[in-house]
């Protein structure tokens, strides 16, 4: 995942550098360009794949999902509106699916992941939710029309954990019972804050995003040292 994220950041950086070099020969007097119709805030929606880096022997499966929604406020640089800074609040959610694994989220001594072939799970996932604030440094090739042109963004986001729960649907347990749901909500072992590096590259209203968490998911000594990551699609006007 680190290599994928590095590729996205590299594309963002190279795209900005290439466009800046091209503009040196054809400078625009932005004081004469009408930017009054450019929106200063936009809803940003992201959906994609969520995973864990350095997960060790923990068995995950299927397509684990991430969904993020932010209201971003965009502040163009007056001397060059192709460059801008954006910040805004929102929510970030991840759903990690496990394979033949029993997760004890409420263990007082730390989260445990135990391989279990006796219990047959139809669904078994860890769902987390964060209140987040992303900060992006952006470049757009068409600042007067934010629905078109190439766009690049790099930055970081900080989040506060608001929810953590294990949701399971059991087909058959060790006692021969099945067809029931279990939900354990407990954040005692979760790291209360997370910091992640983020990047986006795309055209028009669609872009590819990548995120890599720089902090551990669980508190030190209370769970494995896993680092969540995500990749997917972004829908936004900026």
Predicted regions: what they are:
Residues 1-25, 235-238:
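Bacterial Sec-dependent N-terminal signal peptides
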Residues 21, 31-41, 76-83, 142-150, ...:
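Short loop/turn motifs that connect adjacent beta-strands in outer-membrane beta-barrel proteins
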Residues 39-41, 61-67, 127-133, 148, ...:
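Residues that define the transmembrane beta-barrel architecture of outer-membrane proteins
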Residues 45, 69-75, 89-91, 133-139, ...:
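Residues on the lipid-exposed face of transmembrane beta-strands in outer-membrane beta-barrel proteins
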Residues 51-52, 59-117:
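Glycine- and aromatic-enriched membrane insertion/assembly motifs of diderm outer-membrane
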């Amino acid at each position: 995942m680190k290599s994928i994220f590095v590729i996205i950041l590299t594309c963002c950086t190279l795209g900005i550098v290439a466009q800046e070099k091209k503009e040196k020969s054809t400078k625009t007097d932005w004081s004469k360009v009408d930017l009054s119709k450019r929106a200063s805030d936009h809803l940003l929606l992201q959906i994609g794949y969520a995973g864990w880096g350095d997960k060790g022997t923990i068995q995950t499966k299927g397509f684990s999902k991430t969904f993020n929604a932010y209201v971003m406020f965009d502040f163009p640089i007056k001397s060059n509106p192709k460059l801008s800074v954006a910040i805004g609040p929102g929510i970030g959610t991840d759903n990690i699916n496990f394979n033949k694994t029993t997760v004890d989220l409420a263990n007082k001594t730390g989260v445990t992941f135990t391989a279990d072939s006796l219990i047959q799970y139809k669904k078994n996932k860890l769902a987390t939710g964060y209140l987040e604030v992303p900060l992006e440094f952006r470049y757009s090739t068409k600042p007067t029309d934010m629905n078109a042109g190439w766009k690049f963004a790099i930055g970081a986001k900080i989040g506060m954990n608001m929810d953590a729960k294990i949701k399971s649907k059991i087909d058959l347990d060790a006692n021969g019972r099945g067809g029931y749901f279990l939900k354990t909500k407990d954040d005692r072992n979760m790291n209360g804050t997370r910091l992640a590096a983020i990047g986006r590259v795309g055209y028009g209203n669609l872009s590819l995003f990548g995120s890599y968490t720089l902090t551990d998911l669980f508190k030190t000594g209370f769970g494995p040292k896993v680092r969540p990551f995500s990749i997917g699609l972004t829908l936004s006007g900026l």
